C-alpha cells in the first residue's frame, strides 16, 4: 500500500482514539496510552514530511491535516477535563478557537485565497511565522505532546487503585499538579497566539464586505 499524507493523518486520528480509550483502564493501559500519544504526535510530523518531500501537498490535504489536529486536541483535552485533571474551560477554549479560525480559513479559500503565495490569507511575515513556520508547528506539537504525555503519566503514577507510586505526599502531589497546570495553560496560550493572525487577517478580509452588505440593506429597509 502506498502511504500518502492523508492516509497518515487518518492513522494518526485512529491512534489518538485508541490512546484516549486506553486511559483510565489501569496503570499499564495508561502507560500504553502515553506511548500511543507520542506515536500520534510523531505521525503528525510524518504526514507533513511526506507532503513536502514527495510533493503531495494540496489544499484539501492541508484541510484534512487541520481536521486531524482538531480531533486529537479535542479528544485528549475533553477526556482529561471529564476526569477532572484539567479545567473544563480548556477544551471549550480549544474548540472555540478552532471553530473560529477554521471558519475564517474556509471563507478565505472560498474567496480565492490560499495558504501561501501572493494570494495568501496571511500576507504578513509575522502571521506566517506564527501559523505556518516549521518552528511554530514543531513547538506547538511538542507542547501538546508534553502536555498529553505528562497528564497520562500522572494518571498512571498517582491515580487509581493500582497507581505505580501509590499515595504520594501532599507536597509532591501539589508539585505534580502545578506542573500540569503550567503545561496545559502554556499550551492553551500558544494555541491562542497562533490563532491571532488568522482572526486578524480574517477580519481585514471580510469586515469591509460585511459593512458593504449592511449598507446595501439599509436603503431597502428604510423603504
Q: What name fits each language-model region?
A:
Residues 1-9, 13-16, 35, 66-223:
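A feature for the membrane-embedded catalytic helix bundles of lipid/isoprenoid biosynthetic enzymes
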Residues 17, 39-42:
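A generic "structured core" feature
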Residues 19-30:
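Short, hydrophobic transmembrane alpha-helix segments
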Residues 44, 65:
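Conserved G/P- and acidic residue-centered "switch" motifs that form tight phosphate/ATP-binding loops
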Residues 57-62, 68-69:
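Aspartate-rich (DDxxD/NDxxD/DxxxD) Mg2+/diphosphate-binding motifs
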Amino acid at each position: 500500500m502506498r502511504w500518502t499524507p492523508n492516509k497518515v493523518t487518518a492513522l494518526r486520528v485512529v491512534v489518538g482514539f485508541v490512546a484516549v480509550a486506553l486511559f483510565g483502564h489501569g496503570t499499564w493501559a495508561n502507560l500504553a496510552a502515553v506511548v500511543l500519544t507520542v506515536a500520534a504526535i510523531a505521525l503528525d510530523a510524518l504526514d507533513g514530511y511526506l507532503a513536502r518531500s514527495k510533493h503531495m501537498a494540496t489544499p484539501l490535504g492541508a484541510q484534512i491535516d487541520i481536521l486531524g489536529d482538531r480531533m486529537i486536541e479535542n479528544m485528549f483535552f475533553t477526556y482529561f477535563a471529564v476526569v477532572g485533571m484539567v479545567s473544563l474551560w480548556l477544551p471549550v477554549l480549544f474548540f472555540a478557537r478552532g471553530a473560529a479560525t477554521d471558519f475564517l480559513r474556509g471563507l478565505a479559500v472560498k474567496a480565492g485565497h490560499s495558504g501561501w503565495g501572493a494570494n495568501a490569507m496571511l500576507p504578513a511575515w509575522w502571521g506566517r511565522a506564527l501559523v505556518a513556520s516549521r518552528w511554530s508547528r514543531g513547538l506547538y506539537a511538542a507542547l501538546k505532546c508534553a502536555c498529553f504525555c505528562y497528564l497520562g503519566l500522572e494518571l498512571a503514577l498517582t491515580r487509581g487503585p493500582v497507581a505505580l507510586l501509590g499515595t504520594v505526599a501532599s507536597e509532591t502531589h501539589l508539585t505534580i499538579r502545578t506542573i500540569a497546570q503550567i503545561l496545559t495553560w502554556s499550551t492553551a496560550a500558544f494555541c491562542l497566539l497562533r490563532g491571532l493572525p488568522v482572526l486578524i487577517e480574517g477580519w481585514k478580509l471580510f469586515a469591509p464586505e460585511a459593512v458593504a452588505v449592511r449598507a446595501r440593506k439599509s436603503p431597502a429597509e428604510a423603504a
